[in-house]
């Protein structure tokens, strides 16, 4: 039983050792000459302007959650499409109900104005 997982365990151990070894090796032989310029925050070659603690509009989060919600349907549609012939009419009706529920949710979100960007 353990023999089946041995290659994966060896791969994980080698990857962890390589990562840790690289970090330790670079910290030992790397140059350590900190300066004000090197320690300053860097953003795309420009001097940072303003605070990094700005608030985002809640609309970004709402759109992100709606995207995730309606994108997850693909996770359920793909296995159904693969097994469509084996599921037959029962699978078709179940997926029809699923799509109708998603469509009703989409209409609800649309009517509430969550997709409006003002």
Swiss-Prot record:
GO cellular component terms given for this protein: NADH dehydrogenase complex; plasma membrane
Catalytic reactions on record: a quinone + NADH + 5 H(+)(in) = a quinol + NAD(+) + 4 H(+)(out)
Entry keyword Nuclease: no
TM region(s), chain numbering: 5-25, 62-82, 87-107
EC number(s) from the headed UniProt entry: 7.1.1.-
Annotated localization: Cell inner membrane
Pfam family of the protein (one): Oxidored_q4
Single GO molecular function: NADH dehydrogenase (ubiquinone) activity
Main location (coarse class): membrane
Keywords assigned by UniProt, alphabetized: Cell inner membrane, Cell membrane, Membrane, NAD, Quinone, Translocase, Transmembrane, Transmembrane helix, Transport, Ubiquinone
Lipid bilayer topology: Multi-pass membrane protein
Cell inner membrane listed as a keyword: yes
Class of enzymatic activity (EC top level): translocase
Function: NDH-1 shuttles electrons from NADH, via FMN and iron-sulfur (Fe-S) centers, to quinones in the respiratory chain. The immediate electron acceptor for the enzyme in this species is believed to be ubiquinone. Couples the redox reaction to proton translocation (for every two electrons transferred, four hydrogen ions are translocated across the cytoplasmic membrane), and thus conserves the redox energy in a proton gradient.
Subunit annotation: NDH-1 is composed of 14 different subunits. Subunits NuoA, H, J, K, L, M, N constitute the membrane sector of the complex.
HAMAP family documented for this protein: NDH1_NuoA (MF_01394)
Recorded family membership: Belongs to the complex I subunit 3 family.
Protein's UniProt name: NADH-quinone oxidoreductase subunit A 2
Organism for this UniProt entry: Geotalea uraniireducens (strain Rf4)
Lineage: Bacteria, Pseudomonadati, Thermodesulfobacteriota, Desulfuromonadia, Geobacterales
């Amino acid at each position: 039983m353990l023999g089946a997982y041995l290659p994966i365990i060896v791969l994980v151990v080698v990857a962890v050792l390589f990562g840790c070894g690289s970090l330790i090796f670079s910290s030992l032989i790397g140059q350590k000459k900190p300066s004000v310029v090197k320690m300053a925050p860097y953003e795309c070659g420009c001097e940072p302007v303003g605070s990094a603690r700005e608030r985002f509009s809640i609309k970004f989060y709402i759109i992100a959650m709606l995207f995730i919600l309606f994108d997850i349907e693909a996770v359920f549609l793909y296995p159904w499409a693969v097994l469509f012939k084996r599921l037959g009419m029962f699978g078709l009706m179940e997926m029809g109900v699923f799509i109708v529920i998603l469509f009703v949710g989409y209409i609800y979100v649309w009517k509430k104005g969550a997709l409006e960007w003002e």
